[in-house]
Amino acid sequence: MDSQSPSAGARPITHTTTPPARKLPDIHLDIVLVVFCGGAIGTAIRYAFAQIPAAGSFHTGTFVANMLACFCYAGLTAYLAGASRFGARSKELASRGLGMGVCGGLSTMSTLALEGFTAIRDGQVAAGIAYLLVTFALGLVCASAGVWAGTHLAGSSNVSAEASADTNAATTSKGGKA
């Protein structure tokens, strides 16, 4: 056998490539500030809801806070996606400040998990599981309702903005002032 043949123990040539370096995300201080301020507001509202007394294993304050956050965040997202009268920067600030900040500070997955786990640990297994399931199911319902509301609000604001533009254009074309 030829000593140069691959079967004679010669190693095949391999090409190694180094993966491209990961680029760190750009941190914008104005976005950090609106998230921080929104989070403070959402957390304060969450604290107010926490003062609502629980009904057995059903923690009303946590439930209301989470449902409101689901509805508002989904509604805000749908509204901003459909509203054409705002620029990209305004939409980003609103999404980060109101959505991530206020709604993020308002909602509380960790407290929900703790309350459900505590009920189960304390022997209220059915009540704890029911609380968790009802919260998740109604959270989806609230988010769906929020998407519907946000979509319709965006559609009606776009229609009114277009009607206003049409009225201004008609007035201008007739020699009036816009």
Swiss-Prot record:
Description of activity control: Na(+) is not transported, but it plays an essential structural role and its presence is essential for fluoride channel function.
Disulphides: none
The entry's keywords: Cell membrane, Ion channel, Ion transport, Membrane, Metal-binding, Sodium, Transmembrane, Transmembrane helix, Transport
Catalytic activity: fluoride(in) = fluoride(out)
Transmembrane segments: 25-45, 63-83, 97-117, 129-149
Single GO BP term: cellular detoxification of fluoride
Source taxon at top rank: Bacteria
Localization annotation: Cell membrane
Pfam families, per database record: CRCB
Membrane topology: Multi-pass membrane protein
InterPro entries: FluC (IPR003691)
Coiled coil segments of this chain: none
Listed GO MF terms: fluoride channel activity; metal ion binding
GO cellular component, one term: plasma membrane
Chain positions recorded as Na(+) binding sites: 104, 107
Function: Fluoride-specific ion channel. Important for reducing fluoride concentration in the cell, thus reducing its toxicity.
PANTHER family in UniProt: FLUORIDE EXPORT PROTEIN 1-RELATED (PTHR28259:SF1)
Similarity comment: Belongs to the fluoride channel Fluc/FEX (TC 1.A.43) family.
Name of the protein described by the UniProt record: Fluoride-specific ion channel FluC 2
